[in-house]
A protein has these predicted regions:
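Extracytoplasmic/lumenal domain signature
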Residues: 1-209
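N-terminal exported-region signature
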Residues: 208-241
Length: 241
């Protein structure tokens, strides 16, 4: 109805200059946003502070969210040159933060660059380096890639030419750069562009609560294609995937 929600506005000591990201995990929704007071905040749906991560400088880019085997992980960069990764409770992931040596200028995105089942984190700094890290914080092979001009913006990753490997697209101060990573990879269902999707919703729903649906011991039914009020076993048998 346009009214300010109970518990809001949330007040920090400086200004927010980025789009917030909403995370849903374990039946809870919370808001994440970095602030010019050097702090990354997570805010519960009732307006209370969930956690706060202090960094060494301002935060001017939105977070990226990655589903891991232990639930969602929240990645964000700071102008202190570090790329951070935390759990929904604000605890640092093993191997993080990573010191890149230069200001983080774009939101991180994700893809399985070498198709080994473990995604990589792609980011850029205010200098001329394109950075890719493995989930444990170690650098991807042949990274960083150094360019002649500084980057300006967030990367996106996709298999543009349908050859099975991944291209990284990112803007610079004078051009659009495309980097063809020669390893076979996949973007899968990963947050592979700014704010997660083409609609730029900045919303992430964790898949850890998913369940398997079965009918008469037949799993994985296509419920979209299942007609209503059909009980005959013959007709039902044609709809499982």
């Amino acid at each position: 109805n346009g009214q300010i929600a109970d518990g809001f506005p949330f007040t920090a000591s400086s200004d927010f200059r980025l789009a917030p990201v909403i995370v849903e995990a374990n039946g809870e929704k919370f808001i994440t946003a970095g602030n010019r007071d050097n702090t990354f905040y997570a805010i519960n749906s009732d307006g209370s502070q969930r956690f706060a991560i202090e960094t060494g400088d301002d935060i001017s880019t939105s977070a990226g969210i990655l589903e891991t085997e232990n639930g969602p992980a929240i990645f964000f960069g700071s102008e202190d040159g570090k790329l951070y990764a935390v759990t929904p409770d604000g605890n640092a992931l093993p191997g993080w933060p990573v010191d890149t040596g230069s200001e983080i200028v774009g939101s991180p995105v994700f893809a399985d660059m070498d198709n080994n089942g473990s995604p990589e984190i792609i980011s850029a700094v205010s200098g001329t380096d394109l950075l890719i890290f493995r989930l444990d914080g170690s650098p991807y092979s042949d990274i960083p890639i150094d360019f002649e001009v500084p980057f300006a913006g967030s990367p996106a990753v996709h298999d543009l030419d349908n050859d099975g490997d991944i291209e990284v697209l990112i803007g610079s101060t004078n051009s659009l750069i495309t980097v063809d990573i020669k390893d076979i990879g996949s973007t899968g269902e990963y947050w592979n562009m700014y704010r997660g999707n083409l609609q730029r919703t900045g919303y992430f729903g964790s898949g850890t609560d998913a369940i398997t649906i079965s009918v008469e011991n037949i799993p994985d039914w296509n419920l979209v294609g299942l007609p209503l009020n059909v009980s005959d076993p013959f007709h039902l048998s044609i709809f499982p995937d």
